[in-house]
Amino acid sequence: LKCVNLQANGVKMTQECAKEDTKCLTLRSLKKTLKFCASDRICKTMKIASLPGEQITCCEGNMCNA
């Protein structure tokens, strides 16, 4: 599952969402890969434009090593 144009530090990147049960997402740009994982913070649920009605949990904050 992929959704695009995610704003991360003002830079548009391609977002690759992992399995829902991991509550992690990976951000990939040309020069770096960042991975964000959920913990006790509130997560937001995003609809993926190319898959209407399907939702996946994507989280902000608590950056972990790729």
Curated annotation (Swiss-Prot):
Principal subcellular localisation of the protein: secreted
**Per its UniProt entry, which superkingdom is the organism in?**
Eukaryota
Q: Which keywords label this protein?
A: Amphibian defense peptide, Disulfide bond, Secreted
Q: Spell out the InterPro entries in the cross-references.
A: Snake_toxin-like_sf
* Tissue specificity annotation: Expressed by the skin dorsal glands.
Kindly list the places in or outside the cell where this protein is found, as annotated in its UniProt entry.
Secreted
The SS bond pairs are 3-24, 17-37, 43-58, 59-64
**Cellular-component GO terms for this entry:** extracellular region
- Please name the GO terms of the biological process aspect recorded for this protein, alphabetically: defense response
Which purpose does this protein serve, as stated in its record? Answer: Lacks alpha-neurotoxic activity, has apparently no antibacterial activity, nor anti-coagulant potency.
What is the recorded name of this protein?
Xenoxin-3
Q: Which organism is it from?
A: Xenopus laevis (African clawed frog)
Starting at the broadest rank, the lineage of the source organism is: Eukaryota, Metazoa, Chordata, Craniata, Vertebrata
